[in-house]
């Protein structure tokens, strides 16, 4: 499709709705970049047009921040995203603080950390539960939406699927049905590689005002797979033991969730090693016996998650995602009782996964495209209004379907009395957004056998210093303490539901890093929230990295815990470079370390240096880069 064709669509749209375009765009994958860029470019050229973009998670391939990063990233990005990936022009302009005066961008969820310090983005951030986004879009007067869709031909005519993004679109259409005075023009563009997804995502040709049936020439944005380190594995293992057989699973994105999925697969297929990991008692291990387990899954799990991602694919392939649900209360009750065989022809037809949006690796997208006609209906996409809450008229059915639910998310910090910080900093700078986290925490409390689990690393590194992520207090709160439930770190499990403040403090101190336990304990004592005589139990006084390494050693040996258990988008050499460059970045905060590295250097790692274009350094700067890189590569 030519630029002229896109320009014609812009002309026709402006003639219909005028020069004030309030443009709603889907979160993440479903944005038709070239079409969006055509509207953005027109507004840049014509200042009489006002373009207000309302969206979330605007994805662009990363831009290198230094020369060394560029040497590593540029070849990888060209290979991974293609040479001509159509970047979102508005997102680049926003990041560069160069938006024209007649264009605004309002988002309810940022790519993590991408907008810290960006005043324009921070000022226009909207804090909204995922389930409230459609309402808020309508309140802002959205009069135009653009979205990628999938298409298939049937005997009765073409069918369309909202595919990766029925999440807000379906709720928005329902919102407009209740507001007949508001008009919104809905345009869709067919993407030939977008998987055709089943469920409520399937719509007919009249759902949109116009369908553009031409290739957008836009590779699906595939997330590069991230490494999992020792702490990620341990957090994931601890959380995996809280998942009950015949239960329901919701997970988010990130290396902690990847560690959780890996833990569930080990529980299923390497159960002896899995049990060995828990041979030394963890803080909070009694909760495993009460609500989870160490046995392999028999009935399996059902996925009900706002985000459908690679992890669910791996769980399906591992024979864990196999518990069926049915959209009929009587059938679902039979299924929960293990009596679905009493209904001939029903077993094997239920859904295994209900999601609201998907985003993942290129392998994940290919797997979705290749689902056979028996499998495809078992992986359904629906509105976030249905996935992220119980109410809406089918509460009893959804409660039956979501039995023994474990809603597992990540956070950045936890206060000692149980409040969690997941999306922002103390000066109200937003790191990401609340998304659906509050929805799932609230839903866990609304269900008799549901639990909310928040995972976090006990510490973080910043500017060469280690800081505790379990704190006495923090000014920014995402989940208030009255909704406290379960917190998991690499050192153990803290069960906070229904506990007193003192009991919460005691539980969280036991899963904190030992470097910070005493100072935190003293703060709680000084505040009158902890008895002065209470001491950290002996078994929780050795919460150090060495303890974690020993625990993994007992569960199959160190080689059983690779950096990329589900595969990598990087070559073997690039995987070593990722570690080395990370080590160099951390060293940048210490001039002494950098000087020592430059002097010591390391052996000549020809393959890695060639990949970075530093095998034959010419300039003084290149020779310095080569020495620093050889130093960082020594242990990788």
What do the predicted segments below correspond to?
Residues 1-636:
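Conserved alpha/beta enzyme-core scaffold
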């Amino acid at each position: 499709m030519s630029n002229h064709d896109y320009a014609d669509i812009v002309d026709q749209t402006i003639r219909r709705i005028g020069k004030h375009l309030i443009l709603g765009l889907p979160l993440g994958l479903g944005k038709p970049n070239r079409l969006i860029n055509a509207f953005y470019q027109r507004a840049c050229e014509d200042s009489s047009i006002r373009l207000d973009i309302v969206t979330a998670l605007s994805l662009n391939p990363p831009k290198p921040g230094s020369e060394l990063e560029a040497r590593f990233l540029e070849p990888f990005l060209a290979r991974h995203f293609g040479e001509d990936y159509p970047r979102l022009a508005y997102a680049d302009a926003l990041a560069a603080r160069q938006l024209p005066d007649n264009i605004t961008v309002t988002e309810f969820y940022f790519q993590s950390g991408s907008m810290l310090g960006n005043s324009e983005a921070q000022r226009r951030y909207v804090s909204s539960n995922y389930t409230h986004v459609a309402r808020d879009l309508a309140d802002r007067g959205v009069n135009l939406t653009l979205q990628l869709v999938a298409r298939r031909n049937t005997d009765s005519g073409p069918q369309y699927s909202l595919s990766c993004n029925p999440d807000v679109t379906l709720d928005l259409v329902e919102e407009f049905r209740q507001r007949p005075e508001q008009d919104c023009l809905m345009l869709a563009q067919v993407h030939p590689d977008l998987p055709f997804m089943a469920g409520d995502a399937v719509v007919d040709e009249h759902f949109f005002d116009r369908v553009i049936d031409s290739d957008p020439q836009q590779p699906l944005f595939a997330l590069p797979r991230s490494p999992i380190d020792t702490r990620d594995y341990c957090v994931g293992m601890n959380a995996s033991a809280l998942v009950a057989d015949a239960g329901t699973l919701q997970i988010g994105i990130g290396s902690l969730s990847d560690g959780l999925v890996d833990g569930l697969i080990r529980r299923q297929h390497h159960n002896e090693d899995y049990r060995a990991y828990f041979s030394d008692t963890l803080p909070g291990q009694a909760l495993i016996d009460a609500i989870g387990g160490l046995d392999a899954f028999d009935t399996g799990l059902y996925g009900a998650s706002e985000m459908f991602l690679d992890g669910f694919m791996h769980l399906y392939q591992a024979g864990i995602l196999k518990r069926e649900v049915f959209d009929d209360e009587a059938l679902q009750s039979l299924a929960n009782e293990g009596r679905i065989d009493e209904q001939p022809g029903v077993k094997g037809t239920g859904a295994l996964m209900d999601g609201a949006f998907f985003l993942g690796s290129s392998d994940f997208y290919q797997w979705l495209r290749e689902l056979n006609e028996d499998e495809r209906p078992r992986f359904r996409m629906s509105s976030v209004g249905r996935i992220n809450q119980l109410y809406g008229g089918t509460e009893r059915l959804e409660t039956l379907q979501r039995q023994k639910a474990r809603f597992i998310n990540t956070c950045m910090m936890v206060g000692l009395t149980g409040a969690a910080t997941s999306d922002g900093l103390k000066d109200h700078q937003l790191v990401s957004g609340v998304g659906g986290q509050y929805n799932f925490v609230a839903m866990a409390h609304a269900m008799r056998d549901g639990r909310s689990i928040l995972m976090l690393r006990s510490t973080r590194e910043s500017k060469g210093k280690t800081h505790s992520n379990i704190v006495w207090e923090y000014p920014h709160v995402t989940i208030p303490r009255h909704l406290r439930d379960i917190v998991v770190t690499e050192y153990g499990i803290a069960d906070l539901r229904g506990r007193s403040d003192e009991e919460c403090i005691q539980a969280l101190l036991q899963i904190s890093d030992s470097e910070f336990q005493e100072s935190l304990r003293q703060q709680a004592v000084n505040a009158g929230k902890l008895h002065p005589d209470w001491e950290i139990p002996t078994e929780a006084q050795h919460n150090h990295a060495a303890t974690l390494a020993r625990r993994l050693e007992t569960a199959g040996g160190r080689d059983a815990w690779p950096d990329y258990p589900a595969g990598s988008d990087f070559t073997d050499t690039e995987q070593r470079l990722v570690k080395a460059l990370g080590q160099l970045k951390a060293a940048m905060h210490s001039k002494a370390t950098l000087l020592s590295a430059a002097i010591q250097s390391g052996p000549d790692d020809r393959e890695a240096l060639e990949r970075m274009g530093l095998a034959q350094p010419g300039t003084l700067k290149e020779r310095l880069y080569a020495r620093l890189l050889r130093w960082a590569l020594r242990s990788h």
